[in-house]
Amino acid sequence: MLFSSLPFLFYFLPCALGLYFLAPRRLKNAALLLCSLVFYAWGEPRFVLFMAAAILQGYAAARLMERYPARRRLLLTLSAVLSLGLLGYCKYADFLISGFNAVTGLSVPLLRITLPIGISFYTFQILSYVIDVYRGDAPAQRSLIDLAAYIAMFPQLVAGPIVRYTDVAPQLQSRTHTVQDAALGARRFVLGLGKKVLLANVLYELVTVYQQSGQKTVLLTWMYAAAYMLHVYFDFSGYSDMAIGLGRIMGFRFAENFRYPFVSGSLTEFWRRWHISLGSWFRDYVYIPLGGSRVRLGRWVLNLLVVWGLTGLWHGAAWTFVLWGLYFAVFLLMEKLFLGRLLRRLPVLRHVYVLTAALFSFVLFDASSLSAAIGAAGAMLGLGHLPVWDGGTLYYLHSYAPVLLAAAVGSTPLPAALCRRIAAGRAGRVLDALEPIALLALLAVCTAFLVSGSANPFLYFRF
């Protein structure tokens, strides 16, 4: 079920919130778990069994660690093998079989497994929980219902943010529900819906135009790269806003997942602002345990390559995703060794550098093959004897320039800063009075787009 779908907005969500707020305080986690299971089972009920098995083994491993502390390492290893084994079987089996066939020349049939929605996200949450219990950073959760509610919580279940157990554990036991929190959560949810429906979906129309175009030009390829990069940002940050907003309505405080990454002055900073929950997960559970940067140069380079190769592989079972991760690893390596010092001396050029590198990275991210990525990157550089533009390109530029401009400005802190400045002035009270009306109007416009449009799944649902 999609957050940006009519059944969710007008059937599931009102019923879920009604059940949640009518439930007594001691049963709210049970009500949340029930709603989350219904939400997850809506499309593919059988996948609930995969998630239930993953939750049960994580729960058992953590409880056994406290009971048998001398066997903590063995229990952690078994739990990690089970969690990653389930993820690997569902997500990477066909990738490995294809690679085996390519190397050996055999024709082992593919399993063609349907990927359970959100498995990459809830697997990482289970892993972080078990590791935190192993390290002594958190006690094992005694209530299976509370642990399952944390892992299966429908606001963040299928596309994050990846919520740490240590961050949310106190809120599972005791949280407050206020009208102000509900209002702020609803505001965040509607704004996220607007990002998805009015920006991400419209930007993807331009991506589709490029993909279906028989005559490509240099300018059209640059427009495609910009549209796709902004589409991914507004699609995923929009979902994160909706998840954070829903959590706030129910008394949870989730950490931010995006902080205006396109204003970064380096790619190192970019990844501190983009998909923050994933980056911090790999930092704390992979990079630092490998030794981080406090090792000799050769080992540090290897650590960086491993982490970014895994980051790419987490996004998808294809070599293009692995190369996408290694692409960033190379840039981060150069920034650490010498490029960072140069960028600090060139404040204007460093932003051009970040945006250009990011544009080419998203061409690789979207490509179905390495040859397709090379072809698109070559077109952006004017290779292949393509025209710079043609009549069709100018038509699409005229048609999509407003949404590209709106998305470009909207991806910066400028709109939020402008709203804060207005709110601090004489017009602040007027703005406060008009905000609920504006949000209702935005919801109505989004609903109209959804009624007239087709299915629009969130990009990160497939991860």
Which residues fall in each region the model found?
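Membrane-embedded transmembrane alpha-helical bundles that form the catalytic cores
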Residues: 1-462
